[in-house]
Swiss-Prot record:
Stated name of the protein: NADH-quinone oxidoreductase subunit D
Domain of life: Bacteria
Gene responsible for this protein: nuoD
Family: Belongs to the complex I 49 kDa subunit family.
Alphabetical UniProt keywords: Cell inner membrane, Cell membrane, Membrane, NAD, Quinone, Translocase, Transport, Ubiquinone
Cell inner membrane is among the record's keywords: yes
Pfam annotation, one family: Complex1_49kDa
Function, in words: NDH-1 shuttles electrons from NADH, via FMN and iron-sulfur (Fe-S) centers, to quinones in the respiratory chain. The immediate electron acceptor for the enzyme in this species is believed to be ubiquinone. Couples the redox reaction to proton translocation (for every two electrons transferred, four hydrogen ions are translocated across the cytoplasmic membrane), and thus conserves the redox energy in a proton gradient.
Subcellular localization, as worded in the UniProt entry: Cell inner membrane
Listed GO MF terms: NAD binding; NADH:ubiquinone reductase (non-electrogenic) activity; quinone binding
Record-listed E.C. numbers: 7.1.1.-
Signal peptide: none
Major location category of this protein: membrane
Length: 417
């Protein structure tokens, strides 16, 4: 009689649903997954080691490139750790700007997630809808920092600069007539803050569109309900955080439980799931986008009424103004020293965690009193989530593995580092 063996299949790294460079070795009994073994390291760039040879401020752009869909939130964790070691206070206006851009980044991340997740499962329209909205938020990134993705906007002590008074407008081209151009620039006639306000005013209707396409869609529910179930106890034991933990019914959100910046002044709710399956995690993330709108609106209202500095007045950390550099030799020397030698951080260690769109993003920073970190440890939320993939996928079909990878919202920049 023939011996029956399980079949081993390589999923990725060149697979459209592998979310980057994931290689999964699947052990299959027919089409049912018996074991899933994730192989990581294909995007390893030694970020933690590189940071040891760069000044504290030079490592800020490396943070953008970790989870390259949630750029500014990565920076936030890093600058918070530096500020704790330095013992400096951040101006109130800078704190509100940071919270506003954290929520813009959360929406950016969740739009990418809902588009890619739906595309993996087989619904293409949502992907196109989501990227339509992402484009506006990318333009906001570009307006404040000059870059659509890797912004390096947060700095130790505050932010790079205040919100600009004018929003860049679309230019005339061969494919746009005057009427179309006027409509496209309608919301861009005011300041960046006006544009963000306009976006968050119309964004809830966009979320309604995604929900119309997906939430009660029979095929969508068949693909997500009851797939990748994680109990609250196991979610805690496996180190899940963010929507992965809240989807299992545990209301743990660092913005509420361990507030940083001005989150303790914000009025918002923490959505939680009931069943701990892919569908509940989908509902949690969609509701998170609605809560981000609430937080952003509160920040916009405060920023309109209150002016002020956006950088600390500690000149050992803060660079001189551009005007000062062009008129004053001492300011020019100060700027040169600050960006070549950097500032020295007192000896000690600090851990700073932020509520990243994917979970708890933590930075453990050790300083020996020099101008470079002695050790930088990055606590990436996706790392723990990927480790739970084996348990979540067992007993499901190959097609469900795609759904589970999608619901984990995996980006390999932060996992491989």
């Amino acid at each position: 009689m023939a011996e029956i063996k399980n079949y081993t299949l390589n999923f990725g790294p060149q697979h459209p649903a592998a979310h980057g460079v994931l290689r999964l070795v699947l052990e299959l009994d027919g089409e049912v997954i018996q074991r899933a073994d994730p192989h990581i390291g294909l995007l390893h760039r030694a970020t933690e080691k590189l940071a040891e040879n760069k000044t504290f401020i030079q490592s800020v752009p490396y943070m953008d490139r970790l989870d390259y869909v949630s750029m500014m939130v990565n920076e936030h964790g890093y600058v918070l750790a530096i500020e704790r070691l330095l013992g400096i206070d951040v101006p109130e206006r800078a704190q509100y700007i940071r919270v506003l851009f954290d929520e813009i980044t959360r929406v950016l991340n969740h739009l990418m997630w809902i588009g890619a997740h739906a595309l993996d499962v087989g619904a293409m329209a949502v992907f196109l809808y989501a990227f339509r909205e992402r484009e506006d938020l990318m333009d906001v990134y570009e307006a404040v920092s000059g870059a659509r993705m890797h912004a390096a906007y947060y700095r130790p002590g505050g932010v790079y600069r205040d919100l600009p008074d004018a929003m860049p407008q679309f230019k005339a081209s061969k494919i746009r007539n005057e009427k179309a151009l006027a409509k496209m620039n309608e919301a861009r006639s005011g300041s960046v803050l006006d544009f963000i306000d306009d976006f968050f005013t119309r964004f809830p209707k966009c979320i309604d569109e995604y929900e119309t396409l997906l939430t009660d869609n029979r095929i969508w529910k068949q693909r997500l309900v009851g797939i990748g179930v994680v109990s609250p106890e196991r979610a805690l034991q496996m180190g899940l955080t963010g929507p992965m933990l809240r989807g299992s019914g545990i209301a743990w959100d660092l913005r509420k439980k361990q507030p940083y910046e001005v989150y303790d002044r914000m009025d918002f709710d923490v959505p939680v799931g009931v069943n701990g399956d892919c569908y509940d995690r989908y509902l949690v993330r969609v509701e998170e986008m609605r809560q981000s709108v609430r937080i952003a609106k509160q920040c916009i209202e405060w920023l309109r009424k209150n002016q002020g500095p956006v950088m600390t007045d500690n000149h050992k950390v803060a660079p001189p103004s551009r005007v000062g550099m062009k008129t004053n030799m001492e300011d020019l020397i100060h700027h040169f020293k600050l960006f070549t030698e950097g500032f020295h951080v007192p000896e000690g260690e600090a851990y700073a965690a932020v509520e990243h769109p994917k979970g708890e993003f933590g930075i453990y920073l050790v300083s020996d009193g020099a101008n470079k970190p002695y050790r930088l440890k990055i606590r990436a939320p996706g790392f723990a989530h990927l480790a739970s993939l084996d348990e979540m996928a067992r007993g499901h079909m190959i097609a469900d593995a795609v759904t589970i990878i999608g619901t984990q919202d995996i980006v390999f920049g932060e996992i491989d580092r």
